[in-house]
Amino acid sequence: MTISKKTAIVLTLVCLFLIGLAIPSYSWTRTNVSKIEKFYNSKLSPIIMIPGSSATENRFDGLVTKLNKERQGTKHSLLKVKVWNDGRMTYSGSIDAKDNEPVIVVGFENNKDGYSNIKKQAKLFNQAFEALQEKYNFNNFKGLGHSNGGLIY
């Protein structure tokens, strides 16, 4: 059985095309598996707190201080996130590398009462949550909302 020159060229081009697809596919797969692996294996389980109406990201400072005073071993880190009306976020504090249960407080520039404000804050919180999850790769969390902060979840 002989293969014509035309068939040989077509088979060669198909093979080259498949090899050309395989290389970027392999690279893409490795990158995504690495991201998923990092997310899946995360030991970080933050406590995300949202203060109620008229309260700021400083609302839980006393609570965190008291928790750390009574805690043996690694103390809770405190990261405060302020979400501005334009969706911008500013961070203060940090998460210690050895702390698997840091406290993250999310406060809002628009911290006023009212149903329409709570709906806006809920949308802004979703953006903040996604940014935090992307940055810190946690796959679970504990949530605490004080007063209207509980409605934002």
List each language-model region with its residue ranges.
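Short beta-strand element of the alpha/beta-hydrolase
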Residues: 45-52
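N-terminal Sec-pathway targeting helices
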Residues: 1-17
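Membrane-interface motif at the C-terminal end of an N-terminal transmembrane signal
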Residues: 18-37
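Active-site catalytic motif of lipid deacylating hydrolases and related acyltransferases
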Residues: 53-139
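Structural motif
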Residues: 46, 140-142
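Composition-driven low-complexity repeats that form or flank extended alpha-helical/coiled-coil segments
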Residues: 40-41
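Gly/Ala-rich beta-loop-alpha elbow adjacent to hydrolase catalytic centers
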Residues: 144-149, 153
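Alpha/beta-hydrolase fold active-site loops
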Residues: 44-45, 101
